[in-house]
Amino acid sequence: MSAMERLLDFAERTRLIETEDRAYARNCLLEAMRLDAPEENANAEAPLGDTMTEALNALCDDAVRRGVINDTGESRDLFSAKLAGCVTPSPYEVRARFFEKYRRSPEKATKWFYQMCRDADYIKVDRIRKNARFFAEGLEITINLSKPEKDPRDIANALKSKAAGYPKCMLCVENPGYAGRPGFPARQNHRMIPLNLNGESWHMQYSPYLYYNEH
């Protein structure tokens, strides 16, 4: 089974997409990979575990080999978000599912949204697992190893690029769906939940690197 089909299997299993969406999502992935048709006669591989990271990495490797993207950390991250975005529910659908669950249980709705962000690879589960943690009575010390170091080539590209001023910030409401650019992360797999708090409009979102539990 190809990395693309394993990714689609994972997305279907975690309900990021429905069975009826599979062909559409595949075509979105093919466009991103600059392929005309799916790979045939791929070697059999085990299904993905609890994240889509392995399949995304394999697709990025293939994209590098074929010259679709550069082999830098930032290029891979931008491309991974683009691929993950192909199997992430639309902002409207995410909000609809959240508030349907919220009417029955706000706690369950929040847990669902958190899990969806993990499944869609917005929360970088595999990277977070690399963090070093030390515990003492009433204290937890974390050494953050999950956020990748900047590649000098990526730093040079960011210096060459013009400041766009959009989105206004990395936490602003314009981010979901944004393709990213040198120095600014891609957000195709990012989703927010709108909330009304004391008569004001706010949005709930998670951090990709979870500096503390469900942050």
PLM segments and residue spans:
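Active-site microenvironments that recognize anionic phosphate/pyrophosphate groups
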Residues: 1-214
